[in-house]
């Protein structure tokens, strides 16, 4: 059974593509996240901002998706998932905002 995950995309006035993620990211839905990130990246020649401020849980399958695309994404996080992102080394590979 897949864990519920909501993905919404938008474009900011400055042209930045934003993919907002709501729910829990785990093995059951990480493929859905990967497909959404890849679709957003295909729409832009630049990077995509992943808004993870409403993510309540992130496991290693979700981290894998983030690490796989680290060169072309930026992440907006919250203190809830910040420790996982820091331990994975992700802030050394891409911009991660909201680690405070």
Give residue spans per PLM region.
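Intrinsically disordered, low-complexity regions
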Residues: 16, 24, 46-47, 99
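Short, charged, intrinsically disordered terminal tails
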Residues: 2-6, 86-100
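STAS-typified acidic loop motif
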Residues: 1-35
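Amphipathic alpha-helical interaction surfaces in cytosolic regulatory modules
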Residues: 27-94
